[in-house]
Amino acid sequence: MPLLLSGRVFRRDLDACGCLAMHVPLEGGSETRLLRRLRAAGYRTQLSSARGLGDPEVFLFELHGIRPPHLGHQSVGRNGAVGEVQQVMPQLAELFVDNAPVVLWLLEGQVLSRSELLALCDLCKRESRLRVVVEMGGARSLNWQPMSTLLGD
């Protein structure tokens, strides 16, 4: 497997496309090897789950509010009718401090809708340093394709 030795082909495709859809073997291991090779090549990486992502641009780049679960407790009179809102720092803010390219690796990407996947592709086009890899499910062998090819654009 020459791909796992250097990761050069994967890096070249990632830089050319910006947003890749990936199918990985279910036993795992290949994604961590690729992440390790990306880090060694000077990329900054963030591994995250696609579940609960919401609006990708706001979640990744802007300060935003979340509502924690109430766990059965009632907060009568302390907060508004919508409940407590906590401010959360954006996930990718600290990774953009220098000119190194940033790779966002999303697990369980098959739960994302077509519009959310298109929004991730648009983010890669607008922010030149951002690269996105979305795991779209399992396969017998490691393979990837540009997200635009998967979506049919």
Curated annotation (Swiss-Prot):
NDH-1 can be composed of about 15 different subunits; different subcomplexes with different compositions have been identified which probably have different functions. It comes from Prochlorococcus marinus (strain MIT 9313). This is NAD(P)H-quinone oxidoreductase subunit N. It is a peripheral membrane protein. It is found in: Cellular thylakoid membrane. GO terms for molecular function: oxidoreductase activity, acting on NAD(P)H, quinone or similar compound as acceptor; quinone binding. The lineage of its organism: Bacteria, Bacillati, Cyanobacteriota, Cyanophyceae, Synechococcales. Its EC number is 7.1.1.-. GO terms for cellular component: plasma membrane-derived thylakoid membrane. InterPro entries: NAD(P)H-quinone_OxRdtase_su_N. Disulfide bonds: none annotated. Keywords: Membrane, NAD, NADP, Plastoquinone, Quinone, Thylakoid, Translocase, Transport. It is an enzyme of class 7 (translocase).
